[in-house]
Amino acid sequence: MINDIKWVQAQRKATDWRQAVEIATRPLVAYGAAQPCYVNGIIENTLNWGPYYLIAPGIALPHARPEQGANYNQVSITTLRTPVAFGNEECDPVWLLLCVSATDANAHILTIQRISQFIDSPQRLTAVGNASTDDALFALVSG
């Protein structure tokens, strides 16, 4: 799902959902998959509509609309050292953020399908949560 270690971040520290989103989007912005305004789009959308991207207990899929700053299709994966609350009783606290930059609806759907297959394995998720370094996390999510 991830083809380069630059897209993974293991055991990062965030104090709240906003900081978690900012951290999770850093690779997307740093390597050009998204513009800085994309981060603001996710935060503004969350403030307006709530955390619409929480997909399972502990798992968030932060993303904004393509026109909010997506440059090309990419996923970044971030695990948090200490899970944070996003304000959703069913999914809080969140420890895994799969941040998506998608340029159109078709790309978004294909990415969601790949992520669904990825998170379908409890054993894989446990290993991802236990990965203590970027290298260890990349070994689990590459391919």
From Swiss-Prot:
Residues 1-143 form the PTS EIIA type-2 domain. GO terms for molecular function: kinase activity; protein-phosphocysteine-L-ascorbate-phosphotransferase system transporter activity. One of its GO terms (cellular component) is cytoplasm. It is found in: Cytoplasm. InterPro entries: Ascorbate-PTS_EIIA_comp, PTrfase/Anion_transptr, PTS_EIIA_type-2_dom. The phosphoenolpyruvate-dependent sugar phosphotransferase system (sugar PTS), a major carbohydrate active -transport system, catalyzes the phosphorylation of incoming sugar substrates concomitantly with their translocation across the cell membrane. This is Putative phosphotransferase IIA component SgcA. The lineage of its organism: Bacteria, Pseudomonadati, Pseudomonadota, Gammaproteobacteria, Enterobacterales. The gene is sgcA.
